[in-house]
Amino acid sequence: MQQNEKNTEPPIIIVENLEHAFGDFKAVDNISFTVKKGQIFSFLGPNGAGKSTAINVLITLLSLQKGKASVAGFDLKRDPQKVRESIGIVFQDITLDRDMTVWEILEFHGRLYNMPDDERRKRIDELLELVQLETKRNERTKSLSGGMKRRLEIARGLMTRPKVLFLDEPTIGLDPQTRLRMWDYIKGVNNEGTTIFLTTHYMDEADHLSDRISIIDHGKVVISGTSWELKNTLGRDIIYLETSDNDAAVRLLKDLPAIRTIKVKSRGFSLMVNEDGTKVLPGILDVLRNASIELTTINLKKPSMDDVFVFYTGKEIRDEGAAPARGLFLRGGGR
């Protein structure tokens, strides 16, 4: 993950008031964000949130209906072909010809983009070294492991030296060890100067790799920032409690000064607190004890990107089909 705070160049991706609808359904609703050159930018959201639609507009698979957007300095409406020439794409699903060799895949892609012979062969050698597939260059892709296929797809996406590489769920379906190695390859690509636009359902992946993150839900960008900034919006610590009377406990605790927010869950509730949780906890326990409310479960932790994602999208609530009242976010007195 590169640090780009001192980067004074214009953003390499600019999205302003972008909207896209399918009939009467507005999939993307007036979103705006920027990505700086050299960043790893993660674009996160639940299924059906508008994430894929927004990305498909940026890579010119869908037309720009309303708003403004540019990629690598090229306007999506005026110069869609220039945009396509400036980007690389690695889709979620494997799209390799099973009977072609590793070398043939890259060779064909280079020819498709009219790369000169010498440049094409040199680039193939560079990329095979980058993704550590030099010894597999003459093997057919059907013999490769899942991780090797993903690395080959990344190499193919980099063949034309794109300014921006779009990675859609690059580690989905990979075992944990292979996922960690893939993170190293992604960082290596980024260190070569390629801006990366990443989508992932793995929050630890976004946390580890990203310089900046935006979360989209119901077609709108609900929050943007660094992973540290996003986690900090939830408070310093999170205290999860299960009690003999959760509703009464929430009513008693919601106005305590140290509590920023309370999230009610199916079996208990989480307290986002502004202070060190170990110092806040004794006061919380006193309140419950004085009200004769029995504490059955307690857990103290730092906010994670999973917590951020659930907080801002309510994904857990929608997935479980819970009643809306159980997913209310109650503002504490310390907000």
Q: Which stretches of residues belong to each language-model region?
A:
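Short, charged/small-residue-rich alpha-helical element at the C-terminal edge
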Residues: G235-K315
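Conserved ABC ATPase signature
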Residues: R140-L144
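Catalytic Walker B motif of ABC-type/P-loop ATPase nucleotide-binding domains
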Residues: L165-D168
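Conserved catalytic motifs of ABC-family nucleotide-binding domains
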Residues: R161
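Conserved ABC ATPase "signature" region
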Residues: E107, R111, D118-K136
